[in-house]
UniProtKB/Swiss-Prot annotation:
PROSITE patterns: OTU. It is an enzyme of class 3 (hydrolase). One of its GO terms (biological process) is protein deubiquitination. GO terms for molecular function: cysteine-type deubiquitinase activity; ubiquitin binding. This is Ubiquitin thioesterase OTUB2. Belongs to the peptidase C65 family. It comes from Homo sapiens (Human). Widely expressed. Expressed at higher level in brain. The lineage of its organism: Eukaryota, Metazoa, Chordata, Craniata, Vertebrata.
Length: 234
């Protein structure tokens, strides 16, 4: 699997390699070079509308490799998620296969502990899409179960059920801060999103939830999420 030819998630490569995506753009070059002072590597994800969910799922599970105590704690949380889905009105037979796919990869992280095995699962279209669909359903359930809070962040013309049905659950629908907030809280995953755009301004980032210590770093550029690796951690 080469850097330029990958299925869903690429091998890790030098962060400066993405300069090739914008060879003539001075602003992008400045921001990426500035970003490279804090992040050394990147994994690219396929731009299929599922990039946030796939990137978050892979990156967090990779961060757990070799950390038995954290894996055990996360497994306990994952085992509670069917209750969240049921409480939100989802029928078990409609989410069980997606839950099983996600739980299986968590067990793989615990028992195998290798990056190559994890990457293989996330690059298998069927398995990877099942994982993404589970994360989407869990995000939806978290929002539905906390409708009083989240309804303030969606358009007045759309209620929570419609928002989740059209903007969260379907594959290939892009996410916004609402979905990121919900999924990070649903699985207690702290993440930092670095924003790179064409505006001649300083780099900025957002931590979910605020003031948390991130275990996942994502790059948001041209409406797409890739995985970042912090210099002080990798």
């Amino acid at each position: 699997m080469s850097e330029t030819s990958f299925n869903l998630i690429s091998e890790k490569c030098d962060i400066l390699s993405i300069l090739r995506d914008h060879p003539e753009n001075r602003i992008y070059r400045r921001k990426i070079e500035e970003l490279s002072k804090r992040f050394t590597a990147i994994r690219k994800t396929k731009g299929d509308g599922n990039c946030f969910y796939r990137a978050l799922g892979y990156s967090y599970l990779e961060s757990l490799l070799g950390k038995s105590r954290e894996i055990f704690k996360f497994k306990e949380r994952v085992l509670q998620t069917p209750n969240d889905l049921l409480a939100a009105g989802f029928e078990e037979h409609k989410f069980r296969n997606f839950f099983n796919a996600f739980y299986s990869v968590v067990e793989l992280v615990e028992k195998d502990g290798s990056v190559s095995s994890l990457l293989k699962v996330f690059n298998d279209q069927s398995a990877s899409d099942h994982i993404v669909q589970f994360l989407r359903l869990l995000t939806s359930a978290f929002i539905r179960n906390r409708a009083d809070f989240f309804r303030h962040f969606i358009d007045e013309e759309m209620d929570i059920k419609d928002f989740c049905t059209h903007e969260v659950e379907p594959m290939a629908t892009e996410c916004d801060h609402i979905q990121i907030t919900a999924l990070s809280q649903a699985l207690s995953i702290a993440l930092q999103v670095e924003y790179v755009d064409e505006m001649d301004t300083a780099l900025n980032h957002h931590v979910f939830p605020e003031a948390a210590t991130p275990s996942v770093y994502l790059l948001y550029k041209t409406s797409h999420y890739n995985i970042l690796y912090a210099a002080d951690k990798h």
